[in-house]
Amino acid sequence: QETAQKISSILDEVGYIPNMGARLLSQNTSHIIGLVIGFDYLHGENAMQDPFVSTFVGQISSEIENAGYYMMIIRGDDCRKVAEVTSRWNVDGLIVLGWTEKSHKTLKKMLKKPTVAIDTYVSDPELVVNVGTDDFDGAYQLGKYWADHGFRKTLFLTENTAEMDQCRFAGFQRAMTEAFGECKKEERLILLSARKEVRRLQYDELLPRFREAGSLAFISDYLAIDAVDYFIDKGVRVPEDISITGFDDTFYAELIRPRLTTVHQNIGLKASTAMQLLLRLINREKLPEEERNIKIAVQLVVRESVRKRE
């Protein structure tokens, strides 16, 4: 023990840094966690610029480091590429953001590594452990809030029709139907382009409809804030002329004026829960069914972007 302490002290004095390649060869573990970002672009921009993605990456990197691991980012939804990189570096486990259940099925045939999915809609809990958000309840809370403020024709705006978008619309639709008797998808759901310049052209065409409805529920804070920017250019006042809400409660929601009413999801809790589950999987623990598909609770955050309808 005394000799080991002397060697350690000498290594500290000379600033010795161990070679990771040699360590990988000499051990069965790499102490590397792969973070798969399942998309290269969001809203027509680099996905890492999205406030939700960047916040999650920051939170999960802290969790990985605190657990004594290193983080390797792997981008895209190419299952073969992910399997190749993971095997080459002997990655201990994967956290995968934004993949579909189908992609996880494909990866599982190629790779047997502990994996935790983030925000995947999973029909088979044995396929992959998932940590998601209670999207339905969050949008339901928003729908009730809109109804309580007297808005009968609130429009719901999204960029695609993936499972998450469908689930959020379903929650919104349930609340509006309970309040007013109906909420037809073909009348309320508007599909926007992911490209900003095209979205601006859509807004030009939709502006009369926006004014008539007086209320817009966006699928994300990003789209809501982007719309505020457009409205400012057009002389439209928020919330006096058109009220809006977002979803996610990213830090930008408090920076804009008016401050954005939105749904808060605890991204830090999502990251810590995912890492705790992954560590248990790495340690070969079998998780009970109720811990294989966790939904993080959400909360409506009321700020300044919605007025009471007279």
Model-derived features: where do they sit?
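N-terminal helix-turn-helix DNA-binding module of bacterial transcription factors
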Residues: 1-31, 307
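Flexible loop/turn connectors
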Residues: 204-310
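Hydrophobic alpha-helical segments within soluble ligand-binding/sensing domains
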Residues: 130-156, 197-204, 224, 265-284
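Alpha-helical recognition/docking segments in bacterial nutrient-uptake
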Residues: 28-144, 205-211, 222
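An alpha-beta-alpha
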Residues: 142-180, 290-306
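Short beta-strand elements in bilobed, periplasmic/extracellular small-molecule ligand-binding domains
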Residues: 61-75, 153-156, 173-200
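Short, solvent-exposed amphipathic alpha-helices that sit
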Residues: 48-66, 138-142, 163-183, 226, ...
